[in-house]
Amino acid sequence: MKTAIVTGGTSGIGLGVAKMLLGKGYYVYTTYVGADFTEKIENFEPIKVDQTNREELYRFIAHIKEKCSSIDCIVCNAGMTIRKSFTETTDYDWDCMMEVAVNSHYILVRELYSLIPAGSRIIFTGSQMGLMPHAMVLSYGVTKAAVHALAKNLVKEFEGTGTTVNAIVPGFVETPWQKEKPEEIKQNIYRKTAIHRFASVEEVVDAYRFCIENPFVNGSLIEVNGGYSYK
């Protein structure tokens, strides 16, 4: 049985990707924070890990090294948003967002490098906000731009192995977090999206499936945004 890791895999896009991998026969380890994940899913092992905390991250890595002889797929999906203006964002806010989206995933792939066999898949969750600016999420956009750069640069570390590294770049998606937006804000986003709605989780998960199934897609930022533009 192949083994996969999905960070932030108990809700939204992460859970959708995890279930897709389960359907492909993977055993899936996932990290999460917040309330305990109590749903029982076969071959799915959720582990509570605060990815802003290096000690917790390294404990998770040690657990993976103890349990697994190889890791065939890593989906670096976890991210963090703190909605504050540019001048209100503190050093701590900035550090936490960078730690979750960028630093923890750099460490995860680096520490598990020797367990990643030829022909594996590494996929990052980026964001449209990492390509174009957006009000009130400057720091989030910067973290996602760094995620995009990390994905593209990691390609060279796996050159000649058949292992591919890509990033999926979603626009606005019908996740629990997005559903909490005020209706006025959602309608404004709909107007800026050529298809006039948010993506479903399943539509975004299809892009991850494509990266897993196609061995020649490598170093790509794959946008799934419904034709979103800042008009």
Indicate where each model-derived feature is located.
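Residue(s) in the substrate-gating loop at a strand-loop-helix junction
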Residues: 127
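C-terminal substrate-recognition "lid" of short-chain dehydrogenase/reductases
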Residues: 197-224, 229
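Active-site helix of classical SDR
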Residues: 109, 143, 151
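Substrate-binding pocket helix/loop in short-chain dehydrogenase/reductase
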Residues: 85-86, 90-95, 178, 189
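Conserved glycine-rich cofactor-binding loop
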Residues: 10-11
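Alpha-helical segment proximal to the catalytic Tyr-Lys
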Residues: 114, 156-160
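Conserved NAD(P)H cofactor-binding loop of Rossmann-fold oxidoreductase domains
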Residues: 77-82, 227
